[in-house]
Amino acid sequence: MTDRRIDADANIALLIDADNASPDHLDSVLLVLGELGTINIRRAYGNWSKTSLKGWGTLTGEHSILPMQQFDVTKGKSATDMRMTIDAMDLLYRGNVDGFGIMSSDSDFLPLAQRIREEGLPV
């Protein structure tokens, strides 16, 4: 999130790139976002049939995170980033979100964060 303050009753969407984010950092992300508002939308994106996402398994249930299945369409290519970006834009233009949290170690989401900020919302 930016250093820009939002209301305590703000609606926040947390979008997790489970393919490229460590579940070890989830608690700290939830803590920071929880101080900024209410995390009403919690989604984790990935190909849940992969063993590499096993660490996310119990956390999704414990923290009411909706696992969003995205199969790999082509070998060696992940469609997860595209799915997450489309969902973020849908949420942005619906107008019911006051801020976003994007959890990923993938710099591919930088243009998405910039675009959301252009619309006046913190990321």
Segments (PLM) and residue ranges:
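Domain-level signal for Mg2+-assisted phosphodiester chemistry and nucleotide/NA-binding surfaces
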Residues: 1-93, 98, 114-118, 122
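Acidic, divalent-metal-coordinating active-site segment for phosphoryl/phosphodiester hydrolysis
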Residues: 107-113
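Non-catalytic, usually N-terminal nucleic-acid engagement modules in DNA/RNA processing proteins
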Residues: 102
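Alpha-helix N-cap/helix-start capping motif
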Residues: 82, 106-107
